[in-house]
From Swiss-Prot:
It is found in: Cell inner membrane. Its EC number is 7.4.2.11. GO terms for molecular function: ABC-type D-methionine transporter activity; ATP binding; ATP hydrolysis activity. The gene is metN1. ATP binds at G38, H39, S40, G41, A42, G43, K44, S45. It is a peripheral membrane protein. This is Methionine import ATP-binding protein MetN 1. Belongs to the ABC transporter superfamily. Methionine importer (TC 3.A.1.24) family.
Length: 335
């Protein structure tokens, strides 16, 4: 488990204190994929780099599997960092070294394996990320997605328990992003790695994360399971991210629906309820009529969900709304 206990970070810039992270406490369970989302300057990169002490905290404690990382001396920190892999937005590969040599670098620096053992480990890692045929190529000969796969293989070289991902997909096109996220999900599932990733894209969180923390101005303003936070956002920052990811403009929707009669509600379904014939059943039981104004079905990681915006008229509306609630469907009255 990764635990933050009242951790904060302040920089001294031009004689002034700039707070990048306000006192923060939260925990990440082992084997979890935890996402931090926020706009530029929200403090997410600072928080991520505090975990392996690329940044030094100004106060508080960071505890990993019972060990206080913030109290480690140089030798202890060196040992701890072998348990933490990291991948970066711009790959950080050495241009003069081959793919295999880039992956071997942390093993060579550790000095604990023979050359034959390193070669075997590198071959295993390149096979895992699908680059066995590219071992002798140089970074300049690779696509962006292939470079990031090399970065992932290198990060896994020392068999870490934790993988930190610093905007790992923001420099990639959508198709390549999807393939890299699928690889990270496979690594999490097969190796039981704890993954902490930061991003400014809600779609990245939705595809691979179990839990999410939303950051704004150095504060985690909302935290919870991805399904709860994504489908039922509470903080204005979270709501903006959701609206941006779904390309929703609420003011435009209000204008579009202004002429529509009846009550307007938004229903959110999760799991098997997404496919249940609930609307028809409720309409027959309560006599209401409905018009579908907007809708979508998608997945949050492996969980199907659906959202419908309805105009409801006639019949017993109160009974219909109670029926929706009883069916474990989240209902929001928009008008």
């Amino acid at each position: 488990m990764i635990e933050f206990q009242n951790v904060h970070k302040t920089y001294r810039v031009a004689g002034k204190d700039i707070t990048a992270l306000h006192p923060t406490s939260f925990s990440i369970e082992n084997g979890q994929v935890f996402g931090l989302i926020g706009h530029s300057g929200a403090g997410k990169s600072t928080l991520l780099r505090l975990i392996n002490r690329l940044e030094q905290s100004s106060g508080g404690k960071i505890i990993v599997d019972g060990e206080e990382v913030t109290a480690l001396d140089a030798n202890g920190l060196r040992r701890f960092r072998q348990q933490v892999g990291m991948i970066f937005q711009h790959f950080n590969l050495l241009a003069s070294k081959t793919v295999a040599d880039n992956v071997a670098l942390p093993l060579t620096l550790a000095g604990e394996l023979s050359r034959a053992e390193i070669d075997q480990r590198v071959a295993e890692l390149l096979a895992r990320v699908g680059l066995s045929d590219h071992a002798k190529k140089y970074p300049a000969q690779l696509s962006g997605g292939q470079k990031q796969r090399v970065g992932i293989a290198r990060a896994l070289a020392t068999k870490p328990k934790i993988l930190l991902c610093d905007e790992a997909t923001s420099a990639l096109d959508p198709q390549t992003t999807a393939s890299v996220l699928q690889l990270l999900a496979e690594i999490n599932r097969e190796l039981k790695l704890t993954i902490v990733l930061i991003t400014h894209e809600m779609d990245v969180i939705r595809r691979v994360c179990d839990q999410v923390g939303v950051m704004d101005a150095g504060v985690i303003v909302e935290q919870g399971s991805v399904a709860d936070v994504f489908l039922h956002p509470k903080h204005p920052t979270t709501k903006r991210f959701v609206q941006e990811s779904e390309q929703i403009d609420e003011s435009e929707q209000r204008d579009d629906f202004a002429h529509v009669p009846g009550r307007i509600v938004r229903l959110t379904f999760q799991g098997e309820a997404t496919y249940a014939p609930l609307l028809g059943t409720v309409a027959r039981e309560t006599g209401v009529d409905y018009s579908i104004l907007a809708g979508r079905i998608d997945r949050i990681k492996d969980i199907p969900y659906g959202q419908l915006t309805l105009a409801v008229t006639g019949g017993d509306m109160d009974a219909a709304f109670a029926r929706f609630t009883a069916a474990d469907v989240h209902m929001e009255v928009l008008r």
